[in-house]
């Protein structure tokens, strides 16, 4: 399945963050030829799909000489240009898990150019709320700030059963920035990328929270 085939209205409604990541991959011509599995297995630290799928704990079905197995998307890239597939294995399908009712996601990135560029930093968020808009789950995955996707730890303990507020966002931003292990290159310094990761994490959270909140209000009507 090519990336363009993945970009359909049902996905945008169910997992808008994943759809956003798909839509940012290359031009229309590239999207018509590249595959989602290929983007994962290419194992670029700057891949758009990796954080967007990892934050929702998506899985892959892998076929090989020893039969069928499953693994988390986040376990496939093991370093720049390296993946965990064994000889003769390939990805058969990608599984997006069923989501709680008041859940949503988002994906944002920073690029030096506005069009057709790879991410210098990216952030994905998955959030679940209850009817009172208290946070029940909040996951953040960062891209292009380490050899592989960074699934940030220590956030759920901080936010559980709380309303989203500026203080929480600031604390999460600091955690995200300190979780980075980026390189210096022409697209950004270590300090810049670490700072931007915290900023993008806040933006991703606000967007995902708004989408989940909209579901609560829509159902209430």
Explain the meaning of each model-derived region.
Residues 1-221:
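C-terminal structural segment of proteins
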């Amino acid at each position: 399945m090519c990336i363009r085939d993945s970009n359909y209205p049902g996905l945008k409604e169910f997992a808008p963050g994943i759809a956003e990541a798909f839509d940012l991959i290359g031009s229309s011509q590239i999207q018509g030829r590249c595959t989602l599995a290929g983007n994962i297995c290419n194992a670029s630290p700057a891949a758009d799909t990796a954080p967007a799928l990892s934050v929702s704990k998506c899985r892959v079905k892998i076929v090989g000489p020893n039969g069928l197995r499953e693994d988390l998307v986040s376990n496939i890239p093991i370093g720049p240009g390296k993946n965990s597939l064994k000889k003769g294995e390939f990805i058969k399908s990608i599984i997006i898990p069923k989501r709680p009712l008041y859940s949503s996601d988002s994906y944002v990135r920073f690029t030096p150019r506005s069009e057709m560029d790879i991410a210098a930093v990216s952030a994905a968020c998955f959030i679940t709320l209850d009817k009172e808009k208290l946070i029940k789950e909040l996951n953040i995955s960062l891209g292009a700030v380490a050899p592989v996707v960074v699934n940030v730890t220590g956030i759920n303990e901080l936010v559980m059963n709380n309303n989203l507020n500026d203080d929480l966002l600031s604390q999460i931003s600091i955690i995200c920035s300190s979780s980075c292990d980026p390189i210096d290159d022409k697209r950004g310094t270590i300090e810049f990328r670490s700072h931007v990761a915290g900023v993008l994490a806040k933006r991703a959270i606000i967007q995902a929270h708004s989408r989940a909140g909209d579901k609560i209000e829509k159902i209430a009507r």
